[in-house]
């Protein structure tokens, strides 16, 4: 009997040495934007860096193409995304519970990890369009951005500040950044 126990102990030890210890993997998903925009490759670059060392730290990263900043923030808040790329102004509004996030209240659990690049509002018009001031946009064709994007949310702030309705534009296109 003692021989059998000794043999089982040696066999168990040999098997445990030969089998790697499997660390529990943690999966992280980063919400980005449209696949042709800037946010998607940004998320992809982050995931490539994380995944290079995944055997060491046990974290596996993937990206998800989304509607953009506002969508990402709302989805993080709902617990459906781990991280997301977002314009800093919309992160600020979400954290404070202002503007588009007023009804939801402050999202104090939201944190910034780093800044990718500044995103100022830029309005371009042809020289012969007659647009010299923001008020000259009324009655014009304009890309207001896709729903869920920071571009769209920023346009809605401008629209409200100007006292306009969507019908005040000749055409309100909902194009993604890469389509403009």
Predicted regions: what they are:
Residues 47-48, 62-103, 179-180:
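Pocket-flanking alpha-helical
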Residues 19-23:
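Sec/Tat signal peptide C-region and signal peptidase I cleavage site
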Residues 27-52, 115, 119-179:
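Bilobed "Venus flytrap"/periplasmic-binding protein-like clamshell domains
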Residues 8-18:
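Bacterial N-terminal signal peptides
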Residues 12, 80, 141:
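Conserved functional loop/turn residues at catalytic and ligand-binding sites
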Residues 25, 29-31, 35-38, 48-71, ...:
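N-terminal secretory/targeting leader peptides
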Residues 102-116:
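A structural signal for short loop-to-beta-strand junctions that line the ligand-binding cleft
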Residues 1-9:
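Bacterial N-terminal signal peptides that target proteins for export
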């Amino acid at each position: 009997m003692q021989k059998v126990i000794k043999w089982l102990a040696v066999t168990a030890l040999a098997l445990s040495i030969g089998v790697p210890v499997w660390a529990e993997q943690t999966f992280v998903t980063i919400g980005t934007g449209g696949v042709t925009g800037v946010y998607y490759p940004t998320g992809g670059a982050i995931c490539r860096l994380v995944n290079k060392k995944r055997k060491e730290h046990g974290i596996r990263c993937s990206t998800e193409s989304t509607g953009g900043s506002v969508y990402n923030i709302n989805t993080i808040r709902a617990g459906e995304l781990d991280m997301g790329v977002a314009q800093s102004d919309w992160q600020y509004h979400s954290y404070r519970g202002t503007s588009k996030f007023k009804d939801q209240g402050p999202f104090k659990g939201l944190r910034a990890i780093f800044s990718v690049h500044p995103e100022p509002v830029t309005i371009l018009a042809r020289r012969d369009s007659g647009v010299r001031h923001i008020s000259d946009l009324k009655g014009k064709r304009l890309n207001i951005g896709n729903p869920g994007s920071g571009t769209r949310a920023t346009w809605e702030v401008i629209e409200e500040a100007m006292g306009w309705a969507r019908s005040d534009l000749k055409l309100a296109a909902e194009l993604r950044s890469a389509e403009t």
